[in-house]
Amino acid sequence: MGQEDQELLIRGGSKHPSAEHLNNGDSGAASQSCINQGFGQAKNYGTLLPPSPPEDSGSGSGQLAENLTYAWHNMDIFGAVNQPGSGWRQLVNRTRGLFCNERHIPAPRKHLLKNVCGVAYPGELLAVMGSSGAGKTTLLNALAFRSPQGIQVSPSGMRLLNGQPVDAKEMQARCAYVQQDDLFIGSLTAREHLIFQAMVRMPRHLTYRQRVARVDQVIQELSLSKCQHTIIGVPGRVKGLSGGERKRLAFASEALTDPPLLICDEPTSGLDSFTAHSVVQVLKKLSQKGKTVILTIHQPSSELFELFDKILLMAEGRVAFLGTPSEAVDFFSYVGAQCPTNYNPADFYVQVLAVVPGREIESRDRIAKICDNFAISKVARDMEQLLATKNLEKPLEQPENGYTYKATWFMQFRAVLWRSWLSVLKEPLLVKVRLIQTTMVAILIGLIFLGQQLTQVGVMNINGAIFLFLTNMTFQNVFATINVFTSELPVFMREARSRLYRCDTYFLGKTIAELPLFLTVPLVFTAIAYPMIGLRAGVLHFFNCLALVTLVANVSTSFGYLISCASSSTSMALSVGPPVIIPFLLFGGFFLNSGSVPVYLKWLSYLSWFRYANEGLLINQWADVEPGEISCTSSNTTCPSSGKVILETLNFSAADLPLDYVGLAILIVSFRVLAYLALRLRARRKE
Amino acid sequence: MQESGGSSGQGGPSLCLEWKQLNYYVPDQEQSNYSFWNECRKKRELRILQDASGHMKTGDLIAILGGSGAGKTTLLAAISQRLRGNLTGDVVLNGMAMERHQMTRISSFLPQFEINVKTFTAYEHLYFMSHFKMHRRTTKAEKRQRVADLLLAVGLRDAAHTRIQQLSGGERKRLSLAEELITDPIFLFCDEPTTGLDSFSAYSVIKTLRHLCTRRRIAKHSLNQVYGEDSFETPSGESSASGSGSKSIEMEVVAESHESLLQTMRELPALGVLSNSPNGTHKKAAICSIHQPTSDIFELFTHIILMDGGRIVYQGRTEQAAKFFTDLGYELPLNCNPADFYLKTLADKEGKENAGAVLRAKYEHETDGLYSGSWLLARSYSGDYLKHVQNFKKIRWIYQVYLLMVRFMTEDLRNIRSGLIAFGFFMITAVTLSLMYSGIGGLTQRTVQDVGGSIFMLSNEMIFTFSYGVTYIFPAALPIIRREVGEGTYSLSAYYVALVLSFVPVAFFKGYVFLSVIYASIYYTRGFLLYLSMGFLMSLSAVAAVGYGVFLSSLFESDKMASECAAPFDLIFLIFGGTYMNVDTVPGLKYLSLFFYSNEALMYKFWIDIDNIDCPVNEDHPCIKTGVEVLQQGSYRNADYTYWLDCFSLVVVAVIFHIVSFGLVRRYIHRSGYY
C-alpha cells in the first residue's frame, strides 16, 4: 500500500526499492552523483514551457493588457530573531558600540528563504504550498515587494518581469496584492465599495460613467451581482457578506485596474470547502484570461488541487518542487514517496515535507534530500538558462505618467467625502444609536432637574445641570469619535499605504462628513433639556446656550480625533482618554473654584474647554438675574442674592463671554491640526 | 457495527451508548425591528435535528461529517446531553436512560474553542483541575502522578512548565484533551478538535483519540485513584482483584492488523501511559464533529456519520462508506480524499436530483428497524463503573472557594504587568488630582466648593475604576464559568464567593494608596484618624462598586453592551451623588445611589467637627460659617451615627447587588448550553 512508502520515507528507512538509491550511500557524495544522473539523463521532471497562449486575453477594458512572466532567482531572505531579553542586549550592544567605537555589532538573523527560484507564466495559476513555517508568506511578500519591517531581502536576489529587473514602484503599477485578512468599511454595500475603489484607483482621464461601467463588468466577472447591494458587514458584529463573497470583493477591488499580475496570500483560509472552491475558481478564471496568478494555500482539498496549473512546494525555506501536479506525482514517486490512492496529493506532499515534532532530524534530512534532488533537476537548470537568455525580451512599458496617486486631489477628496458620508448615514452606531441615546439622556436629565425655581437649592441644581451638559457632551462625543474613528483606521492605513489617497484628503473628507452629526446631537440635546430644566427664558439665551454646547461638542470631537490618531489601538485610546480629560474637567470651575487653581497650573486651564463653556453658560444664565429674583428667606446668610453674586463667588466675570467663544473656536482648530499631524506621522512611520 | 462481539470478550464488558429519535427545535428568528410584534407573532420553530438515531460502543472513534450548518455540533451536544432547550428523544447507556448529570459524569465534552486560564502553566492547570475533578480523598501524590501521566500521554511533557498562552494551538488542544481525561470518562465528545490546527497537530490530536479508543487495556492501577477509597465499600470481585495487584499489568493489543504498519511508524511518544487510567478495563469511545478532515486523519476514524440538513445520511464503518456510495453510482475517484468526496456529493445540489435524499433513503432502508425497536443492549449491565460513578464525591465547598481564590490570585500575579499598567493609570489620576487641588488653603467659602469637588472626585474615581474594571473582566469569564459549572467542576456559589473575596484586598489596597497621595496634598492638616476613616469608606465603596460592575455585566452579558447601556445608570447614580444637585430635590431616589453614601460619609467626616469658616469681605456674598451648615446646605445628614450608617448601607448595597447578579449569572448558565 501507499502508506508503506510514506512510512518508509518518513522513517528514512531503506526497504523500498525506489528509495534505495537515495539512501544507499551513507557517504553523501556518491548519492549526490547518483541522483544527478537520474535526473540529468533519464528523467525530466517539471517543464518550464509557458502554457499555450490564452485565447481571449483582450477581453478587459483595453488598458494594460500586457502579459507578464514573473521570474525570481536566488532569493535569500533574512529575518530578525526575536530573542528573549534581546531588547536589553541590543541596548547594551549599542552603547558598547558607541563607547568602544564598534559600530557594527550585527543583530542575529535567521535565514528564512534559501536561494529560492521560480517562475510564473501568464495564463497560469501557481499555488505555493507547504506546511506552516515553510516560508510561503515570506516568499509572497518578497515577490510583491511588501516585506514587513525587519525582513531583509539579500541584494543577490533577482526579480524579473519579462526578463527585466523590477523595483517596488514598477511592481506596484502592475501587481495586485490581496492580503490574507481583508479590511472593509462594514457599512457600505459591495457595489459602493467598488465604486469608491474605482474613483481612486483608476487612471485620471476616465469619466465617471466609464468607471461605473468597469465596476459593473468586474461585478459580472467575479459573480458578485447577487450580493452587490448587500452591506459588507463586520464579521461577528454586523451580518453582511459571507466569507467567500468578502474574498471575491477583495479580488474585485484589485481587478478594477486589470493588473496583469495577481498575488494572493491564503485566499481560502477560514472558508469552508465549497466557498474556497468558488474563490479559487474565480482566480482560475482570471488566470485563463491571461493574467499571472500566484497564491499561497495551506491545505487545499482534492478538488481545489485539481484547479492549479502549477504548484510550488516549499519546505524549510527551500523549493522542494515546481511544476505541474502530474509532474509532481512523478517526481515524488521518483524520490520514493508515492502518493497512495484515495489520498489527497496535496495533503500527502505537505505531510512529506513537514517537520514532525519529535523527529526533527529525520524530517530535516528527508526534506534536504528532496530539495537537493529538485535543485539539480532539469527544472532548475532550465531556469538558469531562462534567466541568461530572456533578458532581451520586450522591455516593459513605462507605467502611466508616473503620478504617485492615480486620482487628483479633488477627486480623492470627493471620493473620500462620499464614502465617509455614506458610512455615517449607514453606521447605526453613529446616527441611530447616538440620536436615541442623546434624546434619552436629555429627557432623563430634564426629568430629574424638572422645572427648577430660583431658590437657594435651585441655584445649586442649575449650576450642576449646566455642568452636566458639558460633561455629557464631552464624554459622549469623545468616546463615539474614538470608537468609530479607530475602527476605520486600519482601513485607512492600508489604503494610504497602497497610495489610494493622500492623508489630508482623507482627514478632511472624514471630518467634514461627520460634521452634520455633531451639529445635530447638541441641537437635539439642548432643545429637549433646556426648556425642561427651566433655564433662563428667552430666545437669545437659548441660542447662546445652543451655540456654546455645539462648540463644546465639536471641541470634544476634535479631541477624540486627536486621541485616536495619536494612540495605537482602540482600547489604548479608550483608556488614555479619561485620565487626560479629568484635568480639563477640574479646571471647569465646578469641582474646583477657578480662583483656587494653583498658579503653576494656570496656563493649563486655558486649554480647558470646560472652563470656557462653563463660564459662558453661567454668564448666559446668571448675568442678568437681578437682586430679588432669587427667593431667599431673609434670615439665611448662605443664599446668594443675585446672579452677579453667583458669578462672583465662582470667580467668573460677565465681560469674558466673547473670550469664551474665541477660546473654544481656537481649541477646535488646534486639536484638529494636531490630530492631522499625528495621523500623518503615523501613516509615514508604518511604511 | 458488528465487531463488538469479538472485543467485548477480551476487554471487560462493552458499553454502548444509544440515542433514539433525537429532535431539536429552536425558535425561528425572523428579522424585524419591532421586537414587540415578534413576541405577539406565533412562534415558528426550526428543526435543527431531525430524528437522529444511532449508537456508539466502546472502541469506536466516530467522525461526524457534514457541511456548514448540517447540525454536526448540535448532534454532538444532543447526544452528550449538553444541550439546553427543546430537545426530545432518548439517550441510553446499555439500556439505562441517562440523565444530564449522569452523562456529565461518564462523558467529557471538548469544546471547539479552548477556554483555559491562560496564565497557568500546563502542569499547574491540570493539577488545579485534578483537585476538582478527582475524588476528594485522592492524595496529592496520586494527583501529581495522574497529571504527569496525562501530560506524557498527550505529548506535553516538555511543555509542562510553559504558560498556556505560549503554547501552540495544537498543544492547547491536547491540553484540553488531557483536562477532560482527568476523570477518565468512557465517552469523549469533541467538537471540531482539528479546526485551526496545522496538519500535524491535527493528526496528533486525532491520533491520541484513536489510541484511547482502540487499544485494549487489560489491567491498570486501582480504581481508587480517581474514585477514592470509599467507593469500594461494596467490592465486586472483579474490581478488587484488579485493584489488589500493586503493579499494574499493562498490555496493549493492536486491534486490527492492517493499521499496524502505519501506526507503529507514526506512533506518538508515550501514548502507552494512558493505559494507566483507572478505568483501564474499558476502552473509550470518542465522537468528533469534524470539518474537512485531511486524508490521513480521515483514515483514523473507525466509523463515520454523514449529516445533511439535520438528518443522518449515513452511519457506519469508514471502509463500508465507499461501497455504500458506489452502490448508488457515486464512484470515488482516484487520488481523492474520501471525506472531500462524500461532502461534495452531499452538497452537489445541481447534479442529479439531490444526492443527499437518495443516500438517506438507502441508509434508512438498510437500518430499518435497528433503532426503532428495543435497545441494542438490554438492561443487563450494571457493572462497577456506574457504581463508582455514583459513589463519586467532589471536594467540599469551602475547599472549592479556597482553590478558586488561589487561582484568581495567581492569575492576577501572573498578569502583574497589565495590573501594574492599570495601577499606573490609577496613580496618575491620583497625582493629577492632588496637583490640581494643591492650591486649597485655609478654610474659606471657596474651600467649601473645592473640598466638595475633591471628595466627589475621590468617590467617583474609586467607584468607576472598580465597576468598569469588573465590567471588562467578567464577561470574558462567563463562558468559562458556564462550562465549568455546567460540567459540575465546581459550584457557582463557590466561584462567586471566591471572586468577590479576591477583590476585597485589592479594593482596600488601592483605596488607601489612592487616598494617601491625595491626603498628603490636600487634607494633611487634618490628622491621621481622618485618613483611616476616609480610606476605610473608600475601600468599602470600591467593594460595592465591584458588585455594581458584576451586576451590570451579568445583566448585559457582553462588555460592549454593558459599557454602552451602563451610561444611563451611571448618570442617575452620579446625579444623585449630591454634587450636581441637592439630593433632596427628588426625595427618596438618593438611597439608590452608591455615590450618595460614599459622598455623604466623606463629607460628614470632613466637615462635622469644623466650626469656623471665614466669610468673604463683601457682605452681599453668601457665607457658610460652620461645617454643619455645609452639610445642611447639601442636605446631608449630620447625626452622630451618619458615618457608620453609610458604611452599613454600602455593605447592604453591595450584598444586594451581588445577590441579584448571582441570580442573573445562574439564569444565564441554566439558560444556554455550554458546548
Swiss-Prot record, chain A:
Residues 1-419, 482-497, 553-568, 666-675 are cytoplasmic. Disruption phenotype: Eyes are white due to a defect in color pigment production. Malpighian tubules appear clear or white. Loss of st/scarlet protein in the pigment cells and retinula cells of the compound eye. Transport of cGMP, but not cAMP, is inhibited in Malpighian tubules; however, basal fluid transport rates or rates stimulated by cGMP in the tubules are normal. In Malpighian tubules, uptake of guanine, xanthine and riboflavin is impaired while uptake of hypoxanthine, guanosine and adenine is not affected. Signal peptide: none annotated. One of its GO terms (molecular function) is xanthine transmembrane transporter activity. The keyword Translocase applies. Residues 441-460, 519-531, 590-644 are extracellular. Keywords: ATP-binding, Cytoplasmic vesicle, Glycoprotein, Membrane, Nucleotide-binding, Pigment, Translocase, Transmembrane, Transmembrane helix, Transport. Residues 93-341 form the ABC transporter domain. GO terms for cellular component: cytoplasmic vesicle; cytoplasmic vesicle membrane; pigment granule; pigment granule membrane; plasma membrane; presynapse. Its main location: membrane. Residues 1-30 are annotated as: Disordered. Belongs to the ABC transporter superfamily. ABCG family. Eye pigment precursor importer (TC 3.A.1.204) subfamily. May form a heterodimer with bw/brown. May form a heterodimer with st/scarlet. This is Protein white. It comes from Drosophila melanogaster.
UniProtKB/Swiss-Prot annotation, chain B:
GO terms for cellular component: plasma membrane; presynapse. Induction: Up-regulated during aging in intestinal stem cells. The lineage of its organism: Eukaryota, Metazoa, Ecdysozoa, Arthropoda, Hexapoda. InterPro entries: AAA+_ATPase, ABC2_TM, ABC_transporter-like_ATP-bd, ABC_transporter-like_CS, ABCG_dom, ABCG_transporters, P-loop_NTPase, Pigment_permease/Abcg. It catalyses: guanine(out) + ATP + H2O = guanine(in) + ADP + phosphate + H(+); riboflavin(in) + ATP + H2O = riboflavin(out) + ADP + phosphate + H(+); (6S)-5,6,7,8-tetrahydrofolate(out) + ATP + H2O = (6S)-5,6,7,8-tetrahydrofolate(in) + ADP + phosphate + H(+). It holds the Pfam family ABC_tran. Belongs to the ABC transporter superfamily. ABCG family. Eye pigment precursor importer (TC 3.A.1.204) subfamily. ATP-dependent transporter of the ATP-binding cassette (ABC) family which transports various molecules including bioamines, neurotransmitters and metabolic intermediates. In the eye and probably in association with w/white, required for the transport of the eye red pigment precursor, guanine, into pigment cell granules. In Malpighian tubules, involved in guanine uptake. Probably in association with w/white, involved in aging-induced intestinal stem cell proliferation in the midgut by regulating tetrahydrofolate transport. Residues 34-261 form the ABC transporter domain. The gene is bw. Residues 441-460, 519-531, 590-644 are extracellular. Its EC number is 7.6.2.-, 7.6.2.6. SMART domains: AAA. It comes from Drosophila melanogaster (Fruit fly). This is Protein brown. Keywords: ATP-binding, Membrane, Nucleotide-binding, Pigment, Translocase, Transmembrane, Transmembrane helix, Transport.
